[in-house]
From Swiss-Prot:
<comment type="function">
    <text>One of the proteins that surrounds the polypeptide exit tunnel on the outside of the subunit.</text>
</comment>
<dbReference type="GO" id="GO:0005840">
    <property type="term" value="C:ribosome"/>
</dbReference>
<dbReference type="InterPro" id="IPR003256">
    <property type="entry name" value="Ribosomal_uL24"/>
</dbReference>
<comment type="similarity">
    <text>Belongs to the universal ribosomal protein uL24 family.</text>
</comment>
<dbReference type="InterPro" id="IPR041988">
    <property type="entry name" value="Ribosomal_uL24_KOW"/>
</dbReference>
<dbReference type="Pfam" id="PF00467">
    <property type="entry name" value="KOW"/>
</dbReference>
<keyword id="KW-0694">RNA-binding</keyword>
<dbReference type="InterPro" id="IPR005824">
    <property type="entry name" value="KOW"/>
</dbReference>
<dbReference type="InterPro" id="IPR005825">
    <property type="entry name" value="Ribosomal_uL24_CS"/>
</dbReference>
<dbReference type="GO" id="GO:1990904">
    <property type="term" value="C:ribonucleoprotein complex"/>
</dbReference>
<keyword id="KW-0687">Ribonucleoprotein</keyword>
<protein>
    <recommendedName>
        <fullName>Large ribosomal subunit protein uL24</fullName>
    </recommendedName>
</protein>
<dbReference type="GO" id="GO:0003735">
    <property type="term" value="F:structural constituent of ribosome"/>
</dbReference>
<dbReference type="Pfam" id="PF17136">
    <property type="entry name" value="ribosomal_L24"/>
</dbReference>
<keyword id="KW-0689">Ribosomal protein</keyword>
<keyword id="KW-0699">rRNA-binding</keyword>
<comment type="function">
    <text>One of two assembly initiator proteins, it binds directly to the 5'-end of the 23S rRNA, where it nucleates assembly of the 50S subunit.</text>
</comment>
């Protein structure tokens, strides 16, 4: 499996789709399908049938997953492109480079979910 810079809890920027330009927090990562669920993005309406608990039935809004290639990590409110940098001791780090300066983001092995 390819490394992914997006983890649960990260703030991401949506690059493509109906919600292009929106930002949201990653709720879950579906690594097998290369998809992520982002809070407030790609919201779908689901109808719940009538039952004893719900005599009238109801509609609920749920976030549907979107492909990971359609999101990019948001750092300082803007989409950021990250690269992997290997330090002298062999540790791999996600590195943000902009305007020729490098900024460490986090370790590659550090996963929140």
């Amino acid at each position: 499996m390819k490394r992914r810079s997006v983890c649960v809890g990260d703030t991401v920027y949506v690059l493509a789709g109906n919600d292009k330009g929106k930002q949201g927090k990653v709720l879950s990562c579906l690594r097998e399908k290369n998809k992520v669920v982002v809070e407030g993005v790609n919201v779908r309406t689901k109808n719940i049938k009538r039952s004893q608990e719900n005599p009238k039935g109801k509609r609920i809004n749920i976030e549907a997953p979107i492909h990971i290639s359609n999101v990019r990590l948001s750092i300082d409110g803007a989409p950021a492109k990250l690269s992997v940098k290997v330090t002298e001791n062999g540790r791999e780090l996600w590195n943000k480079s902009s305007d020729g300066t490098s900024k460490l983001y986090r370790s590659v092995k550090e996963r929140k979910g």
